[in-house]
Amino acid sequence: MELIRYADINSDLYRHIWVVGDIHGCYSLLLTRLAQLNFSPDTDLLISTGDNIDRGKENLETLRLLNTPWFISVVGNHEAMALDAFETQDGNFWYVNGGYWYDSVTEKDRQEATELLLTFKQRPHIIEVETSSKKYVIAHADYPDDSYDYGKQVDIDSVLWSRDRLLGSLQGNIHPIRGADTFIFGHMIVDYTTTFANQIYIDTGSFCSGNLSFFKIK
């Protein structure tokens, strides 16, 4: 049984820290937006909510960001689908959800993509960032508990896939999560950055809307 992996970030090491919603292979769009934000790779950090691949056209270029010191990512359900495809040797579920690009690249690029995707077997599902005034928690889809605690083992499928909390909030069933000030999620597309209680949703459908959203932690 796979355990939930956590990572904590020392905010004092960075001038600015941004969280970006699901990139989905929209590498050029990401670079354009970072330039608009005056992002500096030398002093700033970018945290991705996962789903860096699929649906967009620049998947390997996006994955290569994992080699840079200024970019980190939690695991998204699309990275999880890729890992499952590698393990089971059955890529059908991944391919119909956008993973078809993997078979369209050269053998050399496919090997590079495989190596980068396999690093998600060690990457965190949940990232915590504490600044001088607030504690932030980043996960792909949800933190499936009423109270957050670093290292707590929560349901991994819900962290990667669940839409229940957001759908409930959209229907007026809004509840804060204790244990941190702000939770930042991607996964389910919203028209614009959306906040319910202390939860912020920033997947604005980069691959179909051309809108890639960010949240500034510091």
From Swiss-Prot:
Under the GO molecular function aspect, what terms does this record hold? bis(5'-nucleosyl)-tetraphosphatase (symmetrical) activity; metal ion binding; phosphatase activity; protein serine/threonine phosphatase activity
Q: What is one Gene Ontology biological process annotated in the Swiss-Prot or TrEMBL record?
A: RNA decapping
**Regulation of catalytic or functional activity:** Inhibited by cadmium, copper, zinc when added activity but with less efficiency.
Which InterPro entries does the protein's record reference? Ap4A_hydrolase (IPR050126), Calcineurin-like_PHP_ApaH (IPR004843), Metallo-depent_PP-like (IPR029052)
According to the UniProt record, one GO cellular component term is: cytoplasm
The EC number(s) given in the record are 3.1.3.16
SUPFAM superfamilies named among the record's database cross-references: Metallo-dependent phosphatases
Query: What are the alphabetically sorted keywords of the record?
Result: Hydrolase, Manganese, Metal-binding, Protein phosphatase
Residues annotated to bind Mn(2+) 2:
D51, N77, H187
Which cofactors are reported in the record for this sequence?
Mn(2+)
- Which reaction does this chain catalyze? O-phospho-L-seryl-[protein] + H2O = L-seryl-[protein] + phosphate; O-phospho-L-threonyl-[protein] + H2O = L-threonyl-[protein] + phosphate
Which residues does the entry assign to the active site, renumbered to this chain? H78 (proton donor)
For this chain, the family text in UniProt reads: Belongs to the PPP phosphatase family. PP-1 subfamily.
Fetch the NCBIfam families from UniProt.
PRK09968.1
Q: What additional remark is attached to this entry?
A: Neither magnesium nor calcium stimulates activity.
Which protein are we looking at? Answer: Serine/threonine-protein phosphatase 2
What is the species of this protein?
A: Salmonella typhimurium (strain LT2 / SGSC1412 / ATCC 700720)
